[in-house]
Amino acid sequence: MTLVDFTAAWCPPCRVLGAVLAALVPAYAGRVRFTAVDVDAEPALAERFGVRAMPTVVLLRDGREVGRVVGSRPRAFVAGMLDRALAGDMAIAGP
């Protein structure tokens, strides 16, 4: 599974979420690949994924989107989302 964090350097909530995601990396090592996309550097990729606000987190399994969350979220929320996705619960997208 891959978690893609669509972010921007000028976005304060993106920095908060970035710290949350960085703290979760060790707990999900070998199960989730964490990556970040700077929407200013990669606007075509952000457009391809329909990103309209930052931060936006997209979860991919085998190249297919299985979840999406817009906005900064606390660590427990993100961990719960990842746990559900890893367990195969496809209804994980949040507002």
Describe the function of each predicted region.
Residues M1-A8:
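Short active-site neighborhood of thiol/selenol oxidoreductases, capturing the structured segment around
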Residues T2, F49-V58:
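Structural micro-motif
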Residues C11-C14, V57:
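The canonical Cys-X-X-Cys-His
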Residues P13-Y28:
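Typically the conserved alpha-helix immediately C-terminal to a functionally engaged Cys/Sec
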